[in-house]
Amino acid sequence: MSYFGTDGIRGKFGELPITPDFILKLGYVTGLVLIENSQNSARKPSVVIGKDTRLSGYVIEGALQAGFNAAGVDVHMLGPLPTPAIAHLTRSFNADAGVVISASHNPYYDNGIKFFSGDGKKLTDEMQNAINDKLDTIMAATGSNDALMPILDPAQLGKNNRIDDAKGRYIEFCKGSFPYQYDLDHLTVVVDCANGAGYSVAPRVMRELGANVIAINHKPDGININAHCGSTHPEGLQAAVLKYEADVGIALDGDGDRIVMVDEAGHLVDGDGILYVLATQGQTKVAGVVGTLMSNMGLELALKAADIEFTRAKVGDRYVMQELEANGWILGGEPSGHILCLDKSRTGDAIIASLQILAVMQARGKALSDLTEGFEVLPQKLVNVRLSQMQDPFEHEELVAAFDKARATLEGRGRLLIRQSGTEPMIRVMVESDDEIECDVMANDLADKIKDTLG
């Protein structure tokens, strides 16, 4: 079976695959794959491990560490840090891989594992397949662990060390992405940390660049991560921006790789709006922008008006990255807030993306609401249909017929997207149209039909 979804391995803690026993085996087989692929047989491979603020992260961290050590791999422990920090520090420490323990924007009871290669990019499909194949073998042989996980001579085991200055290293990296000729003096910024991995570093970066920072949802307790806060629940940020009369608001998700923003009037600026500002008014001229199938048609039309090419990748930041590299471009992202600025960082980074927007505001002396003028969002309705188990809607003729009929109705003035979640039993129904009422009715009707058919 395949253990990897669209963004690593994820599930509810205590249920396969997110159990201590499975995670131990995952660390072990990943260590074996790293050893097999090592270009330097004279040294032990090494990995860095970071996590978000979920309580279950401590258990998973220990199991992963033990698995890697048993395979003969050294481990550098980073503690709670945003996902892009782990990607950066993987390169900084010349490690063979980076490991993130997080379920991103999911609730606290979920957790997951995602990997970076030594260059700070998501693992290749080939590497994931190699890990998956070894997992299949070891999971199929219940009770044979002694044979499948041979004990190494103690001299060959991996060792661990904790990196005490990991936060400081990442903070300096983020600050280095901000143009030296500007600062954030006289700017009031509300930062919603989602009680997640960015709770400490995000406010510090802004403060050290001179901003008056009002941090909210920055006191994690292990179970309040993403709880009615962060990029998936921006209502609190919008209220805080208005309450404190702030210049701008920034919301991260639980692992710090997604961002949405709020302008001074309390209006939400999602990933599409951020891409528009950076593409049309940013510090670096761009030839083209990569969005996804979920990107609003309004972004495509606004970029076309500015003579900037636009193309769509499959949903997922790894596919945005692939399309950027194929085109030789540097800017891409998703409406959900994964923003890739490849001239600043090799992975999606909420803090770095926000700094680029703040730099544009300072350079042009404009409010965020002024910068987003010219970008008109087409009415869009997204409905998530939660199912009892993973099912494919395209295997049911009556659903396919309903989808085809809706697409014919929207032809030339809108879009329909039906997408299965890669991490949970959910179907996403997205309708765009020049008619807001039609959007709402069509999306809900199709969602009801999916729910009635698939349960």
From Swiss-Prot:
The keyword Phosphoprotein applies. Its cofactor is Mg(2+). It is an enzyme of class 5 (isomerase). PROSITE patterns: PGM_PMM (PS00710). The modification Phosphoserine is found at residue 104. Keywords: Isomerase, Magnesium, Metal-binding, Phosphoprotein. Binds 1 Mg(2+) ion per subunit. It catalyses: alpha-D-glucosamine 1-phosphate = D-glucosamine 6-phosphate. Catalyzes the conversion of glucosamine-6-phosphate to glucosamine-1-phosphate. Mg(2+) binds at residues 104, 253, 255, 257. Activated by phosphorylation. The active site is at 104 (phosphoserine intermediate). GO terms for molecular function: magnesium ion binding; phosphoglucosamine mutase activity; phosphomannomutase activity. InterPro entries: A-D-PHexomutase_a/b/a-I (IPR005844), A-D-PHexomutase_a/b/a-I/II/III (IPR016055), A-D-PHexomutase_a/b/a-II (IPR005845), A-D-PHexomutase_a/b/a-III (IPR005846), A-D-PHexomutase_C (IPR005843), A-D-PHexomutase_C_sf (IPR036900), A-D-PHexomutase_CS (IPR016066), Alpha-D-phosphohexomutase_SF (IPR005841). This is Phosphoglucosamine mutase. SUPFAM superfamilies: Phosphoglucomutase, C-terminal domain, Phosphoglucomutase, first 3 domains. GO terms for biological process: carbohydrate metabolic process; peptidoglycan biosynthetic process; UDP-N-acetylglucosamine biosynthetic process. The gene is glmM. Belongs to the phosphohexose mutase family. One of its GO terms (cellular component) is cytosol. Its EC number is 5.4.2.10. CDD domains: GlmM.
